[in-house]
A protein has these predicted regions:
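Residues at the C-termini of beta-strands that transition into short coil/loop
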Residues: 101, 199, 251
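A mid-sequence, solvent-exposed acidic-amphipathic segment
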Residues: 179-186, 190-222
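Residues at the starts of beta-strands that form the adenosine-phosphate
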Residues: 171, 194, 246
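Structural motif
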Residues: 171, 223-224
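C-terminal functional extensions of proteins
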Residues: 235-319
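Electropositive, gly/pro-rich neighborhoods at or near active sites that engage anionic ligands
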Residues: 6-189, 315-319
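Small/polar loops that bind or transfer phosphate-bearing groups
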Residues: 176, 228-229
Length: 319
């Protein structure tokens, strides 16, 4: 914690110099010609269809945390960073690790996303290379970003169709944020045999990752876990795979499907936490009885129970 405070203080005092150093180091690594080994989107989906394995994703948000930064919906946490680095270097036979395929060809991405990554890597490429294992085969985070980032939107439909094969006639368990509500209002998961939900916080979910893991381990191992909980999903998918479960960290895939159906990726999806769109954190309550009946555990209920216990402990009863 002291190191981070000192580092942040130095950066705040000399931001231009800090950025210039990062750019110089990143240019050096770009000129070296070395790149991580990352399978493309099609190969990633096909691998998951052919192999009964779990998947964790580390996108720019997870790497920003590793670099010592913070995300809007996840505060910096040393234990989380340690876990993310462990996952990045892991080599489990029943688990794959996805990172962003952005270190070479950006052909599939739209102009806005290309611009973002070119500027981002101009500063941070050398930091990515510091942590990425150049001898490891990674898979592609873009496999779950099926619509928004694509230049050619016609690729979305066949990819969604392939994804749906993974949970066809399966008993699935979502581990998601309070306002994620995967599959509500659309048919993305309508071909699943059953749906259950474990609900975590919309923000700073890693504070409760152990509690969520305990609940998940009560589920039968024939179930398929699908996770959408930011960096906490990255960790939980990895931990569940070590316990013999199949767990897929699919992140924004439900929002991607909503945007695909509406042919517009710059809109808030009513009733769902939409962190990439302005105003997307203002979410109304969900009164859908099907959704409510699918919830088998909610961290909010446990937090409320704990508060009530504390109140009971310190309450003064009159004689």
């Amino acid at each position: 914690m002291i190191y981070e405070k000192i580092r942040d203080k130095i950066i705040s005092m000399f931001p231009d110099m800090y950025k210039k150093i990062n750019i110089t180091l990143s240019e050096r690594d770009k000129k070296s010609g070395k790149k991580p080994d990352i399978r493309n989107t099609e190969e990633t989906i096909e691998y998951l269809l052919a192999n009964e394995c779990s998947m964790s994703r580390l996108g720019d948000g997870e790497f920003i945390l590793i670099f010592g930064g913070r995300e809007n919906y996840q505060k910096y946490d040393k234990e989380l960073v340690k876990k993310l680095v462990e996952i990045l270097h892991s080599n489990l036979s029943n688990h794959i690790v996805c990172i962003s395929d952005v270190f070479g060809n950006l052909a599939e991405r739209n102009d806005e996303n290309k611009k973002y990554w070119k500027e981002h890597l101009r500063v941070y490429r050398h930091k990515y290379y510091k942590y990425i294992d150049m001898n490891k085969t990674y898979y592609n985070t873009s496999a779950t970003r099926v619509y928004k980032l694509l230049e050619n939107k016609s690729l979305a439909k066949p990819r969604f169709e392939k994804w749906r094969l993974l949970w066809e006639n399966k008993d699935i368990v979502f581990i998601e944020g309070k306002e994620t509500r995967m599959g509500i209002g659309n048919d993305l998961f309508s071909n699943a045999r059953s749906i259950r939900r474990i609900i975590g916080p919309a923000e700073n979910a890693f504070d409760y990752w152990k509690e969520l893991l305990i609940e998940a381990k009560k589920i039968e191992k024939t179930a398929l876990f699908i996770l959408a909980l930011g960096p906490t999903a990255t960790v939980l998918s990895y931990e569940l795979s070590k316990e013999g479960y199949r767990a897929l960290d699919l992140g924004h895939i439900d929002l991607e499907y909503e945007w695909y159906l509406k042919q517009n990726s710059n809109i808030v999806i009513p009733g769902k936490y939409t962190n990439e769109v302005s105003g997307g954190n203002m979410v109304e309550e969900c009164n859908d009885n099907v959704y409510k009946n699918e919830i088998i555990y909610s961290i909010y209920k446990e937090m409320k129970n704990d508060c009530n216990k504390i109140k009971d402990k310190y309450s003064i009863t009159s004689i």
